[in-house]
């Protein structure tokens, strides 16, 4: 069980929900991509009362030092009220940090109002070696149309 909060473009933080599942928005997958260990296994290890401190310490990589790079994902929600197809922006798919996406073609043309700050139609995944480039890349996705 964990709370989820969302930060808007103007820096305001809003409560989203209390979720009864592992942390959302692919956080564990992003951690695994950056550090190369399974965060789901780690969560079971740290909650197991029989785990020793040595086992826990030996499982985790060293923070920052052992990272292979920077992993990020962007939650896509259409910027238009009416869409007919998925069209991946050239700026996204040709960027060297682009890895994959989970977006699918729209099933209806009218885009409903967002029901929550975390509502998205799918995720786009990135991985690279420069945190500033990653930050700027993720921010730039806000201005692109994935659904037209």
Where are these regions (language model features)?
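Internal nucleotide-binding/catalytic subdomain
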Residues: 1-11
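Active-site "cap" helix and flanking loop/linker of ATP-utilizing ligase/carboxylase catalytic domains
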Residues: 1-2, 19-81
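A structural signal for short secondary-structure junctions
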Residues: 8, 65-69, 115-119
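Protein kinase-like catalytic core scaffold
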Residues: 14-17
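Short proline/glycine-enriched turn/loop segments at secondary-structure junctions
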Residues: 60-64, 89-91, 109-115
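Glycine-rich active-site loop/lid that clamps phosphate-bearing ligands
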Residues: 76-107
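Generic C-terminus detector
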Residues: 103-148
């Amino acid at each position: 069980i964990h709370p989820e909060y969302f930060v808007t473009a103007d820096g305001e933080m809003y409560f989203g929900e209390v979720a009864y599942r592992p942390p959302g928005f692919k956080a564990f997958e992003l951690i695994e991509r950056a550090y190369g260990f399974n965060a789901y296994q780690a969560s079971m290890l740290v909650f197991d009362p029989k785990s020793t401190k040595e086992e826990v310490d030996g499982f985790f990589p060293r923070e920052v030092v052992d990272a292979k790079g920077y992993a990020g994902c962007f939650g896509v929600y259409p910027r238009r009220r009416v869409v007919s197809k998925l069209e991946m922006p050239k700026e996204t798919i040709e960027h060297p940090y682009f890895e994959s996406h989970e977006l699918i073609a729209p099933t209806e043309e009218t885009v409903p109002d967002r029901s929550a700050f975390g509502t998205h139609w799918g995720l786009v995944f990135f991985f690279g070696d420069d945190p500033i480039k990653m930050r700027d890349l993720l921010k730039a996705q806000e201005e692109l149309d994935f659904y037209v």
